[in-house]
């Protein structure tokens, strides 16, 4: 009985750490963002807000991200994905242990076309490090935004809900 409790607690701890590594411990969204939208409305993130959050006891880092749903399109297939964009200050340390091939993207002040994808997505679409693909994002207008990305790395959390 003691072994099963310890195993259960260890598994629970590992799942929590994986979710935290990819999604953070706390997420702050614009109040106007609703669940049915395919992306979040940007939060007006000024320096005072950043400083106030950073000064809270226990806060290690504050990361700005952008999220959007879209379609990955290759020459032979496509798949829907949840896209997460980061800036040049993003801290890759928490997810470093999940990178199984390649490198993290080189992010600078300019728009980057480099991306990491999950092993699960790479297998489904027959993609590997160095390959390129198109990503289609919906916009408020009738036309879609199309961007081309190059895969610099592949990760695997071992947790299908995160890798899908």
Locate each region found by the language model.
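Active-site/binding-pocket entry motifs
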Residues: 34, 88-90, 157
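Hydrophobic, regular-secondary-structure patches
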Residues: 6-82, 106-110
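Generic domain-boundary/flexible-linker signal
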Residues: 37, 73, 94, 144, ...
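Hydrophobic secondary-structure segments that place a key small or acidic residue at a functional site
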Residues: 66, 81-86, 103-164
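Cytochrome P450 core scaffold surrounding the K-helix E-X-X-R motif
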Residues: 90-98
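Hydrophobic membrane-insertion alpha-helices, especially the h-region
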Residues: 1-5
